[in-house]
């Protein structure tokens, strides 16, 4: 019954005020209930039963109707467009255009203040500006508003994707202002409604990022795919943008909490003078601290997710580098084998020339050419694999085993079995991996430093630490 009286209240009083929840389906805002429409013969004959029948479906779709009615406007250099709410939450003006100079004079603002909150297609850094005993200027995400002690003006947007969010905010703002005050100032209720809308969208966005990025990271753990990496890059850019916006909003709230003069200026209904000795701003501090902690939580979650993405990217890069090196090594091995076989076929090619060489008359010519060709091919293959194996080694100082032995790194290598030692000493192992191994004799000998050299090195180390 309460909803019926609430719906019929503007009709009975023919008031100029209206509510977002009371709007009919043809329009959300912009039209008042005029007496000629209310007093028509068809509307008078409407029964209470039909109202009750349609009220349930209307209440469920009230918010969806708001989403489809607000439309973006075109920025104008001469006018500002905004929607106004009075002290009890009723809408007094809908998308009303004010001349900028007149608007500045009526609200006691400067032109530089209007640049922060004016409707524009350019995103401005989030800000909450305080005009003591006059107004609070708010620009947070999709909301640009001016809060006074008995009035709230919400600026219209020029972006179609923001119009939906702004419609939901106006609906929530109206309900918040119409609810019981509970000894909370009007300006604080309006500001809290803005902060609730901002933190709600931050929470929804960080949940979406965590869900989408979490799925991609889990898939990359199983398989490194090009499409997944590209999608992760796109998500990472969006997450970085969200992280930056959340940091800016958190910094705005932190600056307000640290400035007692601004806290005192936010009391518009009950004016307070700034007195450094008396810091009694518990009401506004509790509101700002609550939403500051929420913003800080979203910043930490976004930063943690960015760290996970960065760690995953580094691991993927290491895997890709290892695969790339393996492919290059495989290609080099094929090249070495090809070179060995090519050199092995060189002598038979000479032997097969249609010229007299007096070898074909002997019984051992074929065997000699075959043995020489094989030895030549194996020798070339062995030399190339030996050089390739030296290139593969990564040591602290140089590529030789002697430097590794000199640094003492080989002491930490676990001992191998006799079978492994025999394999490393075999002809095939030396052929394909070179003669340089753990158990081979060092090709160079390094003398131990003398005591004088040790003292000089110690002084150099200490001097370097002092300089750092």
Curated annotation (Swiss-Prot):
Pfam families: MRS2-like (PF22099). Residues 1-33 form a transit peptide. GO terms for molecular function: cardiolipin binding; magnesium ion transmembrane transporter activity. The keyword Transcription does not apply. The chain crosses the membrane at residues 327-347, 365-385. One of its GO terms (cellular component) is mitochondrial inner membrane. Keywords: Ion transport, Magnesium, Membrane, Mitochondrion, Mitochondrion inner membrane, Transit peptide, Transmembrane, Transmembrane helix, Transport. Disulfide bonds: none annotated. It comes from the Eukaryota. It is found in: Mitochondrion inner membrane. One of its GO terms (biological process) is mitochondrial magnesium ion transmembrane transport. A motif (YGMN) lies at residues 351-354. It is a multi-pass membrane protein. InterPro entries: CorA_TM1_TM2 (IPR045863), MRS2-like (IPR039204). Homopentamer. Forms homooligomers. Interacts with MFM1. Belongs to the CorA metal ion transporter (MIT) (TC 1.A.35) family. High-conductance magnesium-selective channel that mediates the influx of magnesium into the mitochondrial matrix. Essential for the splicing of mRNA group II introns in mitochondria by affecting mitochondrial magnesium concentrations, which are critical for group II intron splicing. It also suppresses a variety of mitochondrial intron mutations and its absence may disturb the assembly of mitochondrial membrane complexes. This is Mitochondrial inner membrane magnesium transporter MRS2.
């Amino acid at each position: 019954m309460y909803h019926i009286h609430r719906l019929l209240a503007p009709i009975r009083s023919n008031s100029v005020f209206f509510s977002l929840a009371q709007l009919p389906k043809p329009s959300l805002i912009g039209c008042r209930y005029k007496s000629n429409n209310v007093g028509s013969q068809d509307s008078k004959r409407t029964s209470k039963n039909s109202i009750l029948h349609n009220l349930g479906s209307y209440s469920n779709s009230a918010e969806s109707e708001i989403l489809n009615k607000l439309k973006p406007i075109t920025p104008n250099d001469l006018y500002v467009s905004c929607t106004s709410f009075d002290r009890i939450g009723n809408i007094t003006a809908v998308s009303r255009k004010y001349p900028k100079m007149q608007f500045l004079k009526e609200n006691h603002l400067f032109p530089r203040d209007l640049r922060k909150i004016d409707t524009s297609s350019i995103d401005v850094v989030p800000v909450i500006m305080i005009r003591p005993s006059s107004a609070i200027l708010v620009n947070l995400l999709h909301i640009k508003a001016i809060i006074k002690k008995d009035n709230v003006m919400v600026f219209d947007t020029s972006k179609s994707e923001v119009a939906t969010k702004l419609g939901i905010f106006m609906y929530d703002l109206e309900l918040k202002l119409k609810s019981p005050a509970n000894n909370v100032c009007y300006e604080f209720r309006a500001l809290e409604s803005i902060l609730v809308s901002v933190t709600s969208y931050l929470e929804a966005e960080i949940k979406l990022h965590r869900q989408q990025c979490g799925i991609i990271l889990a898939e990359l753990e199983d398989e490194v795919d090009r499409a997944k990496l590209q999608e992760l890059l796109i998500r990472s850019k969006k997450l970085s943008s969200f992280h930056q916006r959340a940091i800016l909003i958190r910094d705005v709230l932190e600056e307000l909490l640290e400035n007692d003069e601004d806290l005192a200026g936010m009391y518009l209904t009950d004016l307070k003078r700034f007195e450094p000795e008396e810091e009694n701003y518990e009401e506004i501090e509790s509101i700002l601290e609550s939403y500051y902690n929420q913003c800080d939580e979203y910043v930490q979650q976004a930063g943690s997710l960015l760290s996970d993405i960065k760690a995953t990217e580094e691991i993927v890069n290491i895997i890709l580098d290892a695969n790339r090196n393996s492919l290059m090594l495989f290609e080099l091995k094929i090249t070495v084998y090809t070179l060995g076989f090519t050199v092995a076929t060189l002598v038979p090619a000479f032997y097969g020339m249609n010229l007299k060489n007096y070898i074909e008359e002997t019984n051992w010519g074929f065997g000699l050419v075959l043995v020489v060709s094989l030895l030549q091919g194996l020798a070339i293959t062995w030399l190339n694999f030996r050089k390739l194996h030296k290139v593969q080694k990564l040591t602290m100082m140089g590529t030789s085993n002697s430097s590794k032995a000199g640094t003492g790194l080989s002491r930490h290598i676990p001992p191998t079995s006799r079978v492994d030692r025999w394999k490393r000493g075999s002809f095939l192992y030396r052929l394909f991996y070179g003669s340089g191994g753990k158990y081979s004799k060092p090709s160079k000998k390094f003398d131990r430093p003398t005591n004088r050299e040790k003292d000089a090195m110690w002084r150099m180390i200490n001097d370097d630490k002092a300089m750092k």
